[in-house]
């Protein structure tokens, strides 16, 4: 198996049979609720409602800058927000410890989604133990 490294954490390239996987790409399709972009599951964090998991994830990147978090909250479209706040101009304002926090923060955000939304828990239950994959690549043979 090939080794990849993302944020200092080794990952492996794996192959799955079609019947072993639940994949999602678009929020309006069957498994779209698994996407961080899904507005079906707003999250309450520290008394603030974040429209999507992506909004809360991005807010974590800039937690030392409440003015940026406020800007993130003004954008309803999660994909636009993600693209906007991943630009180079914002890089100096990202938490200096973000590389080590981004995966634990994402786990926390996903746990909030699970805890706060019974319908998300039901969606997860419908996967029947299958591997859940975000179809975020254009590689030939990766689309279900």
Each language-model region and where it sits:
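Charged, low-complexity intrinsically disordered segments
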Residues: 1-144
């Amino acid at each position: 198996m090939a080794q990849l490294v993302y944020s200092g954490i080794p990952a492996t390239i794996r192959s799955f049979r079609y019947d072993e996987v639940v994949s999602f790409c678009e929020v309006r399709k069957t498994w779209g609720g698994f996407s961080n972009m899904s507005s079906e599951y707003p999250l309450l964090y520290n008394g603030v409602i974040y429209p999507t998991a992506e909004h809360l994830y991005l807010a974590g990147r800039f937690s030392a800058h409440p003015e940026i978090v406020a800007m993130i909250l003004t954008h309803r479209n999660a994909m636009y927000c993600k693209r906007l706040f991943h630009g180079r101009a914002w890089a100096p304002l990202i938490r200096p410890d973000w590389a080590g926090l981004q995966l634990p923060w994402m786990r926390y955000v996903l746990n909030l989604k699970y805890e706060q939304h019974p319908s998300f828990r039901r969606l997860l239950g419908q996967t029947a133990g299958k591997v859940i994959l975000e179809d975020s690549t254009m590689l030939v043979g990766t689309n279900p």
